[in-house]
């Protein structure tokens, strides 16, 4: 008898080919048979009129801290993700000496907007080395699988101490030791190595990240830790010295390219369109094509929508938080704040005021927020009321600036009234990247590039302003069904981007496809009913910290290693997820 049989579903195998209608039998966590009229099972899932897909693989998350205390890893599990890769952008929590723990917390707080108070209370610190960290992660039963890359920042701090924090160049001994520790981590099961070189990434104190100015010798020296290995990937995030000029751009690209070449492994970097350099992404795609022609398996991580932030009264930032009148009520519960703000007297008072600075020492708000406030009338051309259901590709006439002009009110009043809707829980969406032309035509071009990978969800990060772990659901609903402002994508292609293509890049040979003998990581989805819900704030992080979550309707079941972990939007309590150890997993899959 089989453990589970999924009957009558339309199977998307993860290979991008046309789907087929068939049944799937699962036994001992593995897909054992695909066909019709399969034998009896302990449980039958009726998938008639629905699709069955491999479990989604998210290659770009930041659950590095959360994974040590949270077995569920929401919101990723809410959107069909069965494997999440963390350690991206070079930030993480291992290796670490006891005296450097605060440094790494401030780094993660600043770069990825994860509350330091939650990290201080939640992190278990059962490790020093990276292999220790993997062992600690392995102890916890969890809902989905996780895999971890070696992050450059903690590695540099571990080897160089304060010299790393002050961005001193690494010497030969430093590089040799970082290479040795990276190799040690890879042999223990790390799935790769990641570095961060973005000028916008700063610590909570406003300092540069330790790896942001690492030299070519350092990066290529560490990358040679992969010599002789047949597994592992390397990742980088960089803005390629965008604001420093063309010569600096070319030099930065060459450093990153040399790093990729030295590793001999598949390489990916983040690709997005920035308003102040709207054609840079095109140049990067061409350079990536050239790098591939040189023999590097070069990929570009792309997002299926804008990289944006939410503004709201419970979010990390909203436009009125620096106003004197608002500060007098800022600590009140939301309902009391809303009641006060709805009074004509309070509204008139606050709209007569000017804002104070909101960033600076002790503030979780980045300096970018003050820049936005200085130019809010211009920025508001890209302020959109998210709505229910959420709409991430809205036309210019829907912007709050356009609505304010049409209504004959100031942009400040328009923002004020909008944020008070839904009892103060309404969100304003500000697409920062990928929305220069106020549509997703360029996003479509990125997604269709043969070297594109779905990425950049940042699951677990930017918890007070972003909830892009919902992107897998959005890829299906928007790009295959709902888009009205341009061309769509075929469903088999989108499913492949979420599954088989990810597994191929990562070298995960036991998942990503629906085939006999593969691990039974699966989604049963009612595509007609599939719908994103609005993001909402939940106060469930350690130390009372809050984060944005986002649900979805239409996932009938999510299965991990043969166990149903999510059913009709509810966790079942099953925890079959584990730490994926690269190298070891590849060896088992090859047997």
Report the location of each language-model feature.
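Acidic, glycine-enriched loop/beta-strand segments at the rims
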Residues: 12-23, 427-437, 443, 490-493, ...
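Active-site neighborhoods of metal-dependent hydrolases
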Residues: 133-137, 143, 149-159, 168-172, ...
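C-terminal cap of metal-dependent C-N hydrolases
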Residues: 367-368, 445-452, 469, 524-570, ...
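Short, well-structured alpha-helical segments that form the helix of a local strand-helix-strand
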Residues: 413-419, 490-499, 514
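Divalent-metal coordination cores built from histidine and acidic residues
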Residues: 69-192, 228-229
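Histidine-rich, glycine-flanked metal-binding segment
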Residues: 2-4, 10-55, 535
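Divalent metal-coordination and catalytic microenvironments
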Residues: 9, 29, 49, 60, ...
């Amino acid at each position: 008898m089989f453990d589970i049989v999924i009957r009558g579903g339309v199977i998307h195998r993860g290979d991008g080919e046309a789907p087929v209608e068939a049944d799937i039998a699962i036994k001992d966590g593995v897909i054992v048979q695909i066909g019709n009229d399969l034998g009896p099972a302990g449980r039958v899932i009726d998938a008639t009129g629905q699709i069955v897909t491999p479990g989604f693989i998210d290659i770009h998350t930041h659950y590095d801290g959360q994974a040590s205390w949270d077995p569920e890893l929401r919101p990723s599990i809410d959107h069909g993700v069965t494997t999440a890769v963390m350690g991206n952008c070079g930030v993480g929590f291992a290796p670490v000496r006891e005296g450097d723990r605060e440094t790494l917390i401030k780094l993660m707080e600043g770069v990825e907007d994860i509350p330091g108070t939650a990290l201080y209370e939640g992190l278990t610190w059962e490790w020093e080395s990276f292999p220790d960290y993997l062992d600690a992660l392995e102890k916890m039963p969890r809902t989905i699988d996780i895999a971890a890359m070696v992050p450059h920042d903690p590695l540099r701090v571990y080897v160089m101490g304060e010299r790393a924090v002050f961005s001193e160049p690494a010497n030969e001994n430093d590089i040799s030791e970082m290479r040795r520790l990276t190799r040690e981590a890879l042999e223990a099961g790390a799935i790769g190595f990641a570095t961060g070189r973005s000028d916008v990434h700063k610590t909570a104190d406003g300092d540069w990240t330790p790896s942001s100015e690492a030299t070519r010798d350092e990066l290529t020296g560490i990358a040679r830790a992969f010599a002789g290995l047949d597994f592992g990937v390397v990742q980088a995030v960089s803005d390629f010295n965008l604001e420093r000029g063309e010569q600096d751009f070319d030099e930065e690209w060459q450093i990153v390219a040399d790093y990729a070449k030295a590793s001999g492994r598949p390489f990916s970097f983040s690709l997005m369109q920035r308003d102040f350099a709207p054609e840079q992404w095109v140049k990067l795609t061409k350079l990536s094509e050239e790098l591939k022609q040189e023999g590097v398996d070069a990929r570009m991580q792309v997002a299926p929508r804008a990289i944006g932030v939410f503004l709201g009264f419970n979010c990390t930032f909203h436009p009125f938080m620096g106003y004197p009148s608002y500060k007098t009520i800022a600590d009140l519960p939301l309902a009391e704040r809303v009641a006060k703000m709805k009074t004509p007297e309070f509204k008139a008072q606050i709209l007569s005021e000017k804002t104070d600075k909101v960033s600076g020492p002790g503030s979780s708000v980045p300096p970018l927020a003050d820049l936005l406030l200085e130019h809010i009338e211009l920025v508001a051309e890209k302020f959109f009321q998210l709505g229910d259901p959420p709409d991430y590709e809205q036309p210019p006439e829907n912007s709050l600036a356009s609505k304010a002009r049409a209504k004959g009110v100031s942009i400040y009043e328009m923002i004020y009234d909008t944020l008070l809707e839904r009892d103060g829980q309404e969100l304003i969406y500000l697409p920062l990247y990928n929305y220069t032309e106020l549509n997703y035509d360029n996003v479509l071009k990125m997604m269709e590039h043969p070297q594109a990978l779905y990425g950049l969800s940042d699951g677990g990060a930017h918890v007070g302003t972003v909830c892009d772990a919902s992107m897998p659901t959005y890829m299906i609903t928007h790009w295959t069904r709902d888009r009205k402002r341009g061309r769509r994508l075929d469903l088999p292609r989108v499913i492949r981007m979420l599954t088989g293509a990810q597994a191929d890049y990562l070298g995960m040979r036991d998942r990503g496809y629906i085939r006999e003998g593969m691990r039974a990581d699966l989604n049963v989805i009612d595509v007609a009913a599939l719908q994103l819900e609005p993001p909402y704030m939940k106060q469930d992080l350690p130390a009372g910290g809050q984060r944005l979550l986002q649900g979805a309707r239409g996932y009938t079941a999510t299965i991990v290693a043969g166990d149903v972990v999510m059913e009709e939007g509810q966790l079942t309590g099953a925890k079959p997820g584990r730490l994926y150890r690269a190298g070891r997993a590849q060896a088992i899959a090859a047997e």
